[in-house]
C-alpha cells in the first residue's frame, strides 16, 4: 500500500497536477479502467479504501460507484519506476463499466479472466441455492459427490486423449475444470490460489536453476 508520505515523491508536474491511474482486478489481473487522480483524490482513496478519481470535465472528485454502487475496494497501490503513474489493485463490487461489462476495455479474446467470472457464478450458486441449478445440486449433495464427479471427469478426459478425439477432449477437459473449481469452492478455496502456487513453484525452479549456473 502506498504510504501517505509517499505523495510528496510522486511526479505531479507532467499532467498539470494529476496522475494517470490504472485499475486492475487483484484476483483475475483483468485491467478494469483508467482514470486520473490529483493529490486530494489519492488522499481520499487511501483514507476511505475506495477508489476516488478527479473528473477533468466536471472539475471535482468522484468516487467510483457512488451512484451505481459498483465500488472499487482498494487492495494495493503501487507506482511505476518514474513515479508518475499509479497501479491500483482492487476488489470490484459489481460491474466496473457503465455499459454493464466487468472492464471498460472491450476484448473479443477469451482468456483466463473467463475462469474467474465462472468462479463468481459458482460461488453464488453455492451461497444462494437454486432448484434449477446443477451447481447448487452438487453442493447440496456434498463433498463426496463433488469429488466423485471430479474423478469421473478426469477418467473421461484421459479416455478422450487416448482415443485421439480432440473435440471430446475439449468437452471433457471443460467438464473436469468446472467440477474441479466447484470442489475448490466447496473447500473454501479458489483457482487464484492454485495459480499463485504454480507461480511460486516456477519462481523456485528458476532460482534453483540460477544457483546451478553459478556453481
Swiss-Prot record:
Predominant subcellular localization, coarse grouping: cytoplasm
Family the UniProt entry places it in: In the N-terminal section; belongs to the PRA-CH family.
Presence of keyword Kinase: no
Source superkingdom: Bacteria
HAMAP family (UniProt xref): HisE (MF_01020), HisIE (MF_01019)
Catalytic reaction(s) noted: 1-(5-phospho-beta-D-ribosyl)-ATP + H2O = 1-(5-phospho-beta-D-ribosyl)-5'-AMP + diphosphate + H(+); 1-(5-phospho-beta-D-ribosyl)-5'-AMP + H2O = 1-(5-phospho-beta-D-ribosyl)-5-[(5-phospho-beta-D-ribosylamino)methylideneamino]imidazole-4-carboxamide
Region (Phosphoribosyl-AMP cyclohydrolase): 1-114
Protein name: Histidine biosynthesis bifunctional protein HisIE
Gene Ontology cellular-component annotations: cytoplasm
Keyword terms of this UniProt record: Amino-acid biosynthesis, ATP-binding, Cytoplasm, Histidine biosynthesis, Hydrolase, Multifunctional enzyme, Nucleotide-binding
Region Phosphoribosyl-ATP pyrophosphohydrolase: start-end pairs: 115-215
Pathway: Amino-acid biosynthesis; L-histidine biosynthesis; L-histidine from 5-phospho-alpha-D-ribose 1-diphosphate: step 2/9; Amino-acid biosynthesis; L-histidine biosynthesis; L-histidine from 5-phospho-alpha-D-ribose 1-diphosphate: step 3/9
CDD domains to which the protein is assigned, alphabetical: NTP-PPase_HisIE_like (cd11534)
Intracellular or extracellular location(s): Cytoplasm
NCBIfam families found in the cross-reference section: histidine_hisI, PRK00051.1, PRK02759.1
Species annotation: Buchnera aphidicola subsp. Acyrthosiphon pisum (strain APS)
Record-listed E.C. numbers: 3.5.4.19, 3.6.1.31
GO molecular function, one term: phosphoribosyl-AMP cyclohydrolase activity
